[in-house]
Amino acid sequence: MRRVVLMMSTSIDGFVTGPRGHAGALPEPEELKRWKLERIRRAGTHIMGRVTYEEMAAHWPTSTDDYAAPMNAIPKVVFSKTLDEATWPESSVARGDLADEIASLRRQPGGEIIAWGGADFAQSLSRAGLVDQYVLVIQPVAFGGGLPMFRDLPDALRLDLIESQTFDTGTVLHIYRPSDQASPPGG
């Protein structure tokens, strides 16, 4: 059974975006970029909410960035009740119950399922207990407010740190799994 891996970038104070919207691009350490590219290339499916889908679908098809090829080639599922169709190649729309749709994706063959967010989608996955691994890239910036990574959780989300890496820029990569889970397949 495939695992769901949530990949998110946050500020040191836990916000996905600042009080005025999008966080903006901070310099990405080359070592982190190589790590992320390898992880993305191994993925079997990318999942995301509508807003993230629309941002990515507008960017990746014409991008020359190193991430573009795997982002365009790997199947993507956008979770939305309002999106009529997914026009980004290798994309489809899931409109059913979140837990049922994720269960169906887990049963399919292939690599891990990477969830990209946005924050509302990430929170829905977390509240439903559907995330097997959290890959958090903590940027060396504080927003003092904005859109939080976690909110409205029914209970405390207890996590076990399974990997941590610090980069010269001050960016830190933390990988967690929910404390109540045994080691998921592949990690």
Regions found by a protein language model. Give the residues of each.
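Enzymes that bind and transform nitrogen-containing heteroaromatic metabolites
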Residues: 1-187
